C-alpha cells in the first residue's frame, strides 16, 4: 500500500465529520496514530505528532468561513510538514568546480541507479557531470553505471578490474577535474560491514568531497535512522536521498526517522525511470500524500516540456484543441510515465482517470500522431465536427481502426478536463 492510500481514508473520515467535539477528536487522534504507524513512523514521533496536533485543534479557532473539519486537515498538513523535515524545500547549488559528491548506502538501496538519476537531473539543468564507479566488490556495478551513463549521455570513469576503491576514486576525480560536478558511487554492504565503513571513510579522506549523500531505500521505514546513524559515526552525512518513495507506505517513516537524526533529505526517487527523481519539498510531498494535489509541480513539469508560450497559455486558460495536442505528442514522452503527471492532480480529479486509460496513453502516442496527421485543419481546431464518417476516413488514412480513433479522443477529452481544472485552481490561488 502506498503512503497516499494510507492517508486518503483518514482524510475521507475527517471530511465526513459534521462537528468536532472531544469524543470525535479522540477518535480521530487514534485514526491519525494508526495511519502514521502504518507508514512506519517511529512510535515516539507518532506520539509527539498527535499530542501537538490535538493541542492545536483544541486551542486554535478556525478562521472565519473555514469549517472545523477543513481546519483539522490544515493542522494535520502543517504538522506533517514539520514531522517530515520542516518548511524549506531542499536546494542543490554547487559552490566550486569540480563539486565532488560522494554517494553512500547499503546494498540494495538503489545507490548506483541514484547516481545516474542525480547526474541526469543536474545535466538537464546545464551542469557538466562526470560519474565515477568505485565498487570493486560487485562486478555488475561497473557495467550497470557505465550503461546508465551512456543512456543519459554523461561521461563515465571506472576500472573494471580495479582492486583499490580509494585509488579509483582519486583517479576519477582527476579525470573529471574540468567538470562542474563529479558523482562518486561506492560499494554497498560487504559481508563485513565495518570494512565497508572503513573503505568509504578512506575514500572520503582521499577525495575530500564537497557533499556526502546517504542513499536510503524507503521500504526500510523507521530503520532509516539506524542506517544514517551508523554512517555518521565514521563520516559526516550532509544530505540524504530516499529511493522507491512511489512503491511503499513506509516512505513517511523513513522521512521522519531521517529528520529526527538531523540529516537533511534533499532528493527523493519516485519511480524506476531515470527522470523520476526530484528535490524534496516537504510541503509539496505532504500535499500529495493528503490528496490535495500539487499543481505547482504539474505546472513546473509542463513548463519544462511545453516551452512554447502559446501552448502554456492554452493549458492555463483551459483551451486545448487537437492541433495543440498534435504538436505536443513528442513532448509528452519527455514527461515520463503519464501516471506520474496524473498523480500531481488533486485526488478528486485524478481518480476519474483510470489506470487503463493512463497505460493506453503511454503506449499509443505514436499511433495518435498518425491519427492526428490524417485529420484536416478544421478537425484539429474543431474536434466537435468529428462524426462517424469522418472517424472512419481518419482511421483508414492512419492505418488504424475507428475504435483506435475514439480511444484517442477519450484521452484528449481527459486532457481538456485537466487543463480546465488547472485554470480553476490557478484562479483560486490568485484570490
UniProtKB/Swiss-Prot annotation:
Q: Which organism is it from?
A: Pyrobaculum calidifontis (strain DSM 21063 / JCM 11548 / VA1)
**Where found?**
Cytoplasm
Q: What class of enzyme is it?
A: hydrolase
Note what the entry says on domains. Composed of three domains: the N-terminal N domain, which is responsible for interactions with the ribosome, the central G domain, which binds GTP, and the C-terminal M domain, which binds the RNA and the signal sequence of the RNC.
Q: What is this protein called?
A: Signal recognition particle 54 kDa protein
Show the GO cellular component annotation of the record. Answer: signal recognition particle
Return one Gene Ontology term, BP aspect: SRP-dependent cotranslational protein targeting to membrane
Q: Which UniProt keywords apply?
A: Cytoplasm, GTP-binding, Hydrolase, Nucleotide-binding, Ribonucleoprotein, RNA-binding, Signal recognition particle
